[in-house]
Swiss-Prot record:
Cofactor(s) essential for the protein: Mg(2+); Mn(2+)
Cellular localization per UniProt: Cytoplasm
Record bears the keyword Translocase: no
EC number: 6.3.2.4
A single Gene Ontology CC term: cytoplasm
Binding site for Mg(2+) 1: D248, E260
InterPro entries: ATP-grasp, ATP_grasp_subdomain_1, D-Ala_lig_Van_CS, D_ala_D_ala, Dala_Dala_lig_C, Dala_Dala_lig_N, PreATP-grasp_dom_sf
Protein name per UniProt: D-alanine--D-alanine ligase
Entry keyword Cytoplasm: yes
Residues binding Mg(2+) 2: E260, N262
GO molecular function: ATP binding; D-alanine-D-alanine ligase activity; metal ion binding
Catalytic activity: 2 D-alanine + ATP = D-alanyl-D-alanine + ADP + phosphate + H(+)
Species lineage: Bacteria, Bacillati, Bacillota, Clostridia, Eubacteriales
Length: 301
């Protein structure tokens, strides 16, 4: 089977995507698959470069990759692909839409407000959230242009920085707690990982540099584990995820809050999903096998 590993792309996460893609190419079972690296440099590359492949393994991150656009093109071309479909991908990429759906489904998430320009900043609403707050692009990933803002004076600059990457900016309540992540594959939760960033929060350096954060499988107390699992699976269902996804949470005073959902989690040697899979003795190669097998079973018609 010819497996095209699609990486690169045009988002701010291009370099991370290439790291993921190269890791995947090296880890795929050579006896089962012919791995074909496909590096996208511009949108137009996609249709030409996927000709002749049997399956698209997506190692893309961010816009034009994680937002449902590539999934829609592949679906139109009749090429099966890994992970969530176009709708779920688009929803999960939009942080505001994700949180609206979670709130509708009574899944706990941090409070937030949205702005599209500095003129829309409502300092009273932000005061109501309580400082510090996180300010980030609505459709960004890997914590690109994400700022932890301690005071009113720093809000405008942080919003302007986030607006360089997106037309909408989220201003979100800061929940000081323990960050955990819940990888889900085929509707089942893998071991929960704790994330202890060396910096103030799990920023882009913490995520992708060796030693940027301590990440390890954590044993939660029984009641908390049950609630985390219930929330993670409910989130996965509400957002119509398929095959695999990663639900990120914060736990404050034994109370979990859903942060966001990654429909194409990183697949570098530092990535969280492979670390979690290793907790049930699933190798990186076996994880990729499972993703391909489950993705092929999902009806894309």
């Amino acid at each position: 089977m010819k497996v095209g590993v699609i990486m690169g792309g045009i988002s701010s996460e291009r370099e991370i995507s290439i790291q993921s893609g190269n890791s995947v190419v090296h880890a795929l079972d050579k006896d089962k698959y012919e791995a074909i690296p496909i590096v996208l440099n511009e949108k137009e590359d996609l249709i030409e470069k996927v000709k002749g492949i049997d399956f698209a393994l997506l190692a893309l991150h961010g816009k034009f990759g994680e937002d449902g656009t590539v999934q829609s093109v592949l679906k139109t071309l009749g090429i099966p692909f890994s992970g969530c479909g176009p709708l779920s991908s688009a929803i999960c990429m939009d942080k505001d839409m994700t949180k609206r759906i979670l709130a509708f489904g009574n899944v706990r998430t941090a409070r937030w407000v949205m702005v599209s320009s500095v003129d829309e900043i409502d300092y009273e609403k932000i005061e109501n959230l309580g400082y510090p707050v996180f300010i980030k692009p609505n459709n960004g990933g890997s914590s690109v242009a994400t700022t932890l803002v301690e005071s009113k004076e720093a809000v405008k600059d942080a919003v302007l920085e986030a607006l360089k990457y997106d037309t909408e900016v989220m201003i979100e309540e800061y929940i000081k707690g323990d960050e955990i992540t819940c990888p889900i594959i085929d509707g089942k939760m893998l071991p929960v990982l704790a994330i202890k960033p060396k910096g103030k929060f799990f920023d882009i350096a913490s995520k992708y540099e060796d030693g940027g954060a301590d990440e390890f499988i954590v044993k939660l107390n029984e009641d908390l584990h049950k609630e985390v699992e219930k929330m993670a699976l409910e989130t996965y269902k509400l957002l119509k995820c398929d095959v695999y996804a990663r639900v990120d949470m914060l736990v404050r005073d034994n109370v979990p809050y859903v942060l966001e959902v990654n429909t194409l989690p990183g697949m570098t040697k530092n990535s969280l999903f492979p670390k979690s899979a290793a907790g049930i003795n699933m190798s990186f190669e076996e994880l990729l096998d499972t993703i391909i097998e489950k993705s092929l079973k999902v009806n894309r018609e």
